[in-house]
UniProtKB/Swiss-Prot annotation:
Gene name tied to this protein: nuoI
Family: Belongs to the complex I 23 kDa subunit family.
Protein location: Cell inner membrane
Organism annotation: Albidiferax ferrireducens (strain ATCC BAA-621 / DSM 15236 / T118) (Rhodoferax ferrireducens)
Membrane topology term: Peripheral membrane protein
Protein name: NADH-quinone oxidoreductase subunit I
Record domain 4Fe-4S ferredoxin-type: where: 69-98, 108-137
Binding positions ([4Fe-4S] cluster 1): C78, C81, C84, C127
Length: 177
């Protein structure tokens, strides 16, 4: 005959109550762990910046406000190939062109709707003459939607104003192109 096995569960003795259990029951150990973590970071140097007064350095590859560039002789670079318009996933670019007397094409209308633009940089990558670029300008605003609709003249003005910065950023990024 076999002996019966006991399936009884052993219950721990509840009368044995230590100081550690007492403190953890009041969650004081968690409180001290939190205070230790706070004290660890309280006296380190701060990494938060006060944004408008302090600015972080931007990468030369930062994609900000668009600009149209000109050649050194003052002629605009855009040859109206419309590759940027075709590749734009947000359909934010509108181009109209006409043929000049010398047989070359130039834009009569080059508009970018920054309300639609997703700043992907495809327009900049597709441009064969390096005409459309995204600058490192990140602080611009509009009080209405129409203020963020940039025409050809506005884009050329941005390019003319920031050409030294654009050229420096292009030179810094040249080995990666």
């Amino acid at each position: 005959m076999s002996t019966p096995t006991s399936n009884a569960i052993e219950i721990p003795n509840e009368s044995a109550f230590s100081l550690k259990d007492f403190l953890s029951s009041f969650m004081l150990s968690e409180l001290f762990k939190g205070l230790a973590l706070t004290g660890k970071y309280a006296f380190r140097s701060k990494i938060t910046l006060e944004y408008p007064e302090e600015k972080t350095p931007l990468s030369p590859r930062f994609r900000g406000l668009h600009a149209l560039r000109r050649y050194e002789n003052g002629e605009e670079r855009c040859i109206a190939c419309k590759l940027c318009e075709a590749i734009c996933p947000a359909m934010a670019i509108t181009i109209e062109s006409e043929v000049r007397a010398d047989g070359s094409r130039r834009t009569t209308r080059y508009d970018i709707d920054l309300n639609k633009c997703i700043f992907c940089g495809f327009c900049e990558e597709s441009c064969p003459v390096d005409s459309i670029v995204e600058t490192s300008i990140l602080e611009y605003h509009g009080e209405s939607r129409s203020d963020l609709y940039f025409t050809k003249d506005m884009l050329l003005a941005v390019g003319d104003r920031y050409e030294p910065q654009i050229a420096a950023a292009r030179a810094a990024d040249a080995k990666y192109r």
